[in-house]
Curated annotation (Swiss-Prot):
GO terms for cellular component: cytosol. The gene is leuA. Homodimer. Belongs to the alpha-IPM synthase/homocitrate synthase family. LeuA type 1 subfamily. It comes from Sodalis glossinidius (strain morsitans). Its cofactor is Mn(2+). It is an enzyme of class 2 (transferase). This is 2-isopropylmalate synthase.
Amino acid sequence: MSQQVIIFDTTLRDGEQALQASLSVKEKLQVAQALERMGVDVMEVGFPVSSPGDFESVQTIARQIKNSRVCGLARCVDRDIDVAAEALRVAEAFRIHLFLATSTLHVESKLKKSFDQVVEMAVHSVKRARNYTDDVEFSCEDAGRTPIDNLCRIVEATIKAGARTINIPDTVGYTTPNQFGGIISSLYQHVPNIDKAIISVHCHDDLGMAVGNSIAAIQSGARQVEGTLNGIGERAGNTALEEVIMAIKVRQDLLNVHTGIHHQEIYRTSQVVSQLCNMPIPANKAVVGANAFAHSSGIHQDGVLKNRQNYEIMTPEIIGLKEVQLNLTSRSGRAAVKHRMQEMGYQESNYSLDELYDAFLKLADKKGQVFDYDLEALAFINNQQEQSEHFRLEYFSVQSSSADIATASVKLAFGDEVHAEAATGNGPVDAVYEALNRITQLPIQLEKYQLTAKGHGRDALGQVDIVVEYEGRRFHGVGLATDIIESSALAMVNSMNTIWRARQVGIELRRLHQHNNSQDMQETV
């Protein structure tokens, strides 16, 4: 009987570190819920001590997630461990993930300690974390470049101290599959208490070998793989979990292991991560790319028509890609839209049918037939909209030609008031943005603008993703419409609402921080 490989997702921790603009608490919760639906065993959702915002998001997710174990990261520092435990204690099940550098380079140049001191710190921290939970993971940072004798020593010591999972990261993506698999084999051969812990791996993709190294580790006995959806992460990224999961599924004959993943949720979860993180998936990306199941060669097309297995080692249906069965138009009712959403894997609890249907009718009136990619885009935007937005775009008009400077008139509602402003700019989008900035008086700088067609043809929806800078922080905005000027305006308004909410949260967090400090002072006195 095959053994299970635990899937540990760190999209919301290691993956988010690569984003130009941090996710909001609501966006992080959406990602976490998608990962839960996909069936990940453990999700690492943040570094609680790093900021009040991270603490809040970890605590919020820990409170909401019921079917996956929620994990928080902590250095081998007492305060880190205590804060992580405080954020996680509301969870159904939680894990504290400790990490400490072990390579000679890191120990000497970064920590400036002896290896004996490093082992002592690790043991102390594992024991402290065990006071809060029996599920403690310890990571040997830069294990791929750690002398094997030292690695075996600290692994044995931390298992003895109570760590249930030992993670072996290839932190800088330095090793090759043969070499990395050998490291895992050495641990099984030379650590006497290795049977008392699960060996995990966490590989980075600097040399393009993260997935290969993870598979080699599984073959050598590792039973947990850490990574992110779509492989997002620092530098060249992390192990792409969807690739490891499907490699295990397709090559069970070779690997003789399995996962608890709901494979039909893979594509949808990949899209959620791509959309919310504003990181498009390359067309040639394995498993989830647009071309993953496309065949352009005549010979290949003929072979697929005769038997799909000629050129497909897995079917698109396995990861949740289904063929269109209904043509949706403005005459389609709520039941038809709901049915199609269910076929695509969406539950009604994940979106508002009334709001989605209203948006569907408006789009259907404009373009006639509405396709799956249109519905998914509408559902995504619908999910992004707060129940009560502070700013609302009421109206805009643009005059532009190749000979004259562009002029825009905009009406923006906030509260019970509607404000109007006109402005000129270097093109219609710039003019609209200048008018919006004049109304709100927010010192916003546009850093990134990206337009993506959500579908095919001239009537395709255009999604605009922007990154703006405000008071030293970056914020993401997204807009969707068949008119790219409208979607550009909506993206800016969306970013302004995100900024406004962040300001309100910041004010509340500062108030709570001042209140807690006041209490601490009273207790000290």
